[in-house]
């Protein structure tokens, strides 16, 4: 494991006692570590606390090693996984991903897991995303493929924020919320 990853996981572990159980964790690699999560939370007035436990450069294998410290120990009810982007050269990446999802299901049986598809559009990403779908039951394990292009980086983040925030809800969506999400 890279020293940076272990250091970051240790830092997160130290603040676990500040986290509220039953909330949302985003567990990812480089893309999600740089994603404007807190702007999203403020914009959508999330009903839940959201903890970004993403680490730049995190591989799936490393994610398994730090899973308890970064995710399980705060007992979330939803876990977004955005991993695989650092694993293109790893022939075991998807089997490790299966192990990760299985570990979360075993350790957090009530949690809903949302798998976020890889963004880069490579043949590896396309294959990996298709394989991710095989893990979904649309009850406890769901899949979302985020918008990959926009007229600007700001517009792209806004579109992705709308997609992700729809999973943040615990209460049924109202007609007003639906119009707001679609931009009408």
Regions found by a protein language model. Give the residues of each.
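Serine-esterase "nucleophile elbow" of acetyl-processing enzymes
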Residues: 1-75
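Alpha-helical cap/lid subdomain in secreted, periplasmic
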Residues: 43-45, 65-184
């Amino acid at each position: 494991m890279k020293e940076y990853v272990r250091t970051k996981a240790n830092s997160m572990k130290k603040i676990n006692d500040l986290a509220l159980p039953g909330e949302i964790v985003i567990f990812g690699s480089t893309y999600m570590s740089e994603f404007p999560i807190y702007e999203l939370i403020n914009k959508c007035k999330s009903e839940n606390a959201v903890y970004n436990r993403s680490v730049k450069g995190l591989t799936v294998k490393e994610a398994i090693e730090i899973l308890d410290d970064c995710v399980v120990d705060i007992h979330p009810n939803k876990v977004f996984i955005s991993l695989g982007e650092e694993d293109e050269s790893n022939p075991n990446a998807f089997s490790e991903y299966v192990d990760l999802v299985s570990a979360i299901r075993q350790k957090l049986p009530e949690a809903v897991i949302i798998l976020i598809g890889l963004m880069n559009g490579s043949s590896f990403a396309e294959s990996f995303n298709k394989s991710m779908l095989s893990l979904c039951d649309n009850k406890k394990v769901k899949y979302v493929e985020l918008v990959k292009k926009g007229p600007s980086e700001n517009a792209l983040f806004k579109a992705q924020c709308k997609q992700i925030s729809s999973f943040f809800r615990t209460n049924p969506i109202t007609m007003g919320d639906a119009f707001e999400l679609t931009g009408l």
